[in-house]
Each structure stands twice: as C-alpha cells, then as structure tokens.
Amino acid sequence: MQQQKTLISEAARPKMIAKTALLIVSNPNHIGKILPSLTKQVNKTLYIQLLSALSSPLGSFCPEIFNVWPKFTQTISGIYAQTLQFEDLDVRVLLSGLKYKNVEYIKTRQPIDLVVFDKCYPEDDITNFIKTRIPSITDSYSILLGDSGEFEEPTVDATRDYNVYKHSVLGGTFDRLHTAHKLLLTEAALRATEKVTVGVTVENMLGSKTLWELIEPLENRINGVKDFLEDINPEIIHNVVPISDMYGPAKDDPTMDVIVVSSETERGGVKVNEMRCKCGLQPLKIVTVDLINDPNPSPHEEIKVSSSTRRIRTLGKVIQAITPKAHLTEKPYIIGLTGGICSGKSGVGRRLAELGAYHIDCDKVAHFVYEPGKPAYNKIVETFGKEVVGENGEINRKEIGAIVFKDPKQLQKLNSIVWPAIVEEVQERIRKSNADVVVMEAAILLGAGWNKHCHEVWATVIPPDVALQRLQERNKLSLEDAKSRLAAQIDNKKYIEAANVVFYSLWDTETTKKQVDKAWELLLERIKCINT
C-alpha cells in the first residue's frame, strides 16, 4: 500500500496512527494484499464497506450474484478469514449498504480517522465520496490508496439455502468477541428482516470452560454483542438477553423462525426444536455456520478460532489497567505475586528471579520474624503464653496454629503481630537490595492488604480439582483435609479480579515459563515508558 502523493492534499495525508479506519472494498477476495500495510496505520477498529465503484449506490455490489442477502455469507466469511492474522484489530463488515438499496450514507458508531480504498480513484471522486457518503468522518481524516490487484469475481455456493426470515436467534458465551462470533452474528443479521435475538450465557453455565474465571462479565459480553450488531446493521431490532440454560427464549417464542448455530453446536439447535415441539411451537430452520481455524494455534490452544484461545493468549499480559500509586516511588518497581495453594507461585517467582528480579518469599520472611530475638517473637510469647514456645526456644508453629485456627479472634491477634513485622522486614530488604524490580511473593498479599505496597499485582491460578490433587500429593493429606485447606482460601475469581497479570500453571513447566517470560518483557517495556 502507498500513500496518494499527487491527488491527495497535504492536509489529508496520514500524520499519525488512526484509531478507526474505513476500507472501501471493490475486490473482496484480495484484501489480504492490503491488510499488512493497513494494520500499521490503524490500531483499533477497521470498518469494511463493499462497493463496486465510488459512483455506485450502496446496495448494488455485484447485484447479479448477490440477489438475496444471505448470499453475501461466503464473501464476508472470506473477508474475515483474511483478517485472522490481525486479531488485535476489531474488523467489522458493514451490512446496511449491502442489504438495503435506499441507504445513502455509510454509518458507523465510531468516527472515521482514515479512509482506505483498495484501488485508485480520481481525486474529485474521492473528495466527493467522503463528503457526501461518510457522515462520521473526522475533521483531520487521512486517506490511503491501495492496490488489491486484478478483480476476482465473488462466488456463491449454489447448494446452500438462502431463505430470509423475519426473526433469527442464536446463543453463546460471546466472550472477547472474535471472528467466529462475528460470522455467527453476521449470518443472523443477513437472515433477518426485522429482528435478531441473541442469548448470552450467565456465569452458572461457564464452569466447564478453560480459564472461565477470565471470561468477561455478563454485562460486558451483552454490550459487546449489541455494539457489533448496531454497527453492522442498525436497521433491525437487536434483542440481546442473558440465558441460564441452552434453550433461552428460543424454546417458547412463537415469533422466531430460524436459529443460527456453528457446526460444533448444531446438536443444540436440534434440542431447541425438540423443546419447541413439546411447547406446541413450529421448529426453527437451522442454519449452520462452519467453524473457522486459527492460523497460528499453539500447544494447549484449540485449532478453531475460540474464546478459550483468546483467554489463553492473555496470560502474561496486562488484563486490568494499572492504577498509579502516588505513595510509591518509581524505583524499585514492586510486583506483588500471589495465588492459591499449589497454583505455581514459587515457580513463577523463581523464574522472575532468573530473569533479573529481586525475589522475596514472604513465607520465608514469616519464619524469620518468628525467630527468637525478633520483635514478633516477643509479642507472640506475650500474647499467647510460653506454652507456644518449644523446647528449643523457638515458636512452635503447630502449637500456635492449633490455637488460632480454631478461633478467628486469636487468628486476628496473631496476624496483627506478624503481618506488620513481615512488611517491615520486606521493606528493609528492598532498601538494602538497590534492585530495579522486586517481586514480593505472598499467598496472603490480598488478605493482608499488602497490594497497596505494590505497583502491580500478578496472580497464579489453577483449576480447583488440580490444586486439590497437587496438595494431596505434596503434603500427603487426606481428601477431606486438602479440601478444608482449599476452602479456607479465596477463590480464583477473586485473585483474577485483583490482578493486573495472570498466569496459569496447568500445563508443562515450559508453557508457564513462556507466560512469565512474556510478562517480564512487557513489564520492562512499561517501566521504560515510565522512566522516559
């Protein structure tokens, strides 16, 4: 792709990375020739409008081929498939200008900073097109001209059913809206003349999914679906609702005509129809959308494009905005590392130490502050009596454990002595270290409120059943004792809610190591930005 140098005015040339771009496509089978350069010019949203020529009215793209809306499916799927390499870019193929012949403008919910054409047009045509057809254009917009090569006529699968209905329905989790979701939602919109209903699963249906704790909140997922549908086809009604079973409103809504499913969930469509028949309703026409393969699946990721894979790819990355803490100095940069029992904290801490961090294990610090002569030692003896002191003069941790774990008030007394002593010792070690990055590993980081001493919180999580098995094997515990220990800690979801970065140590050590290495590399980039 090259920037127009003679036809486009200096004011219209790209000056910076655009937030949102609109790509006018006349040759949809070959947009892959343009995308690599285009994605360097835009960082958030890419709208795509099919249009044979700038002078053509919207709704007239290859009319001899696309004489009914659903026939666009194959071409639109091909467009999305060509964008799979650029998963950080939110690509949206607009439908209004394809479905309706009376649409005058290309409407988008986001203002357009950059307009891209897949072939060269005269300057006057470009200027007139932008002024008259794109109402959401910004004042400081830029223009790029690309070359998608020789035109290849789109094709349509003659064996498919292309009927259109009043009311379509589909359901799913819709976590981290991705290309496969967009294909399903697009199919539902192309099939509907009046209304699309989307059921979005609530939390009680998510437990079996990989890294389900990282699934976006229901409200976010519902809003994501609404936003997409309102962008690509605002003319129809969008009814996006939570569902707590596999049927949702499809089981008893007589106005629905067609259900859109993936090839993986086709059986679900059959079950919905079985339920409708029990309710005395007509079965829905089932339209199946093929799964789309991920171009670069890694071990432990699914071959298909999926939300599970996208969640896995967030591991080691910032998942929650980092809030600056005015009371903390820029150096050292302190990471609070926490997580449940047997979740892999220590392994992550050791790897961070290998990479250059100063690693402080607060559990070992706790042992240190219990030692005779330390401030915590004297206070513990004063509070709990000499009976907690062993024959060797040291605190008998089992003895004091038997006291405090039966009585929350006694536990609170112990914590009020030990926790401040640990923090004081940790801070003293940090002062002496002169380190750039400190990792403060503590299972009780959140419960003790120590996250206030950290620039970021990193958490390790593991499925509860795996943690249970690891704990039994490591500590030689009975099933009941292991369950009791796990029940006493906060759950994975709370760790994730508090964390800026998350690790998942379910798989082999090398996979966890890669997560940590990625997190370290990104951390150094953040610190560099802070210091410049």
What kind of region is each of these model predictions?
Residues 1-330, 464:
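Nucleotidyltransferase catalytic core that binds NTPs
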Residues 115, 196, 258, 359, ...:
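Short, well-ordered beta-strand core segments
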Residues 168, 325-364:
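Walker A (P-loop) phosphate-binding motif
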Residues 178, 259, 363, 414, ...:
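Residue-level signal for inorganic ion chemistry
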Residues 249-252, 423-432, 437-474:
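ATP-dependent NMP and nucleoside kinases share a basic, alpha-helical "lid"
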Residues 364-435:
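ATP-dependent small-molecule kinase phosphotransfer cores
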Residues 425, 434, 451-453, 473-532:
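Small-molecule kinase domains that catalyze NTP-dependent phosphoryl transfer to phosphate-bearing small molecules
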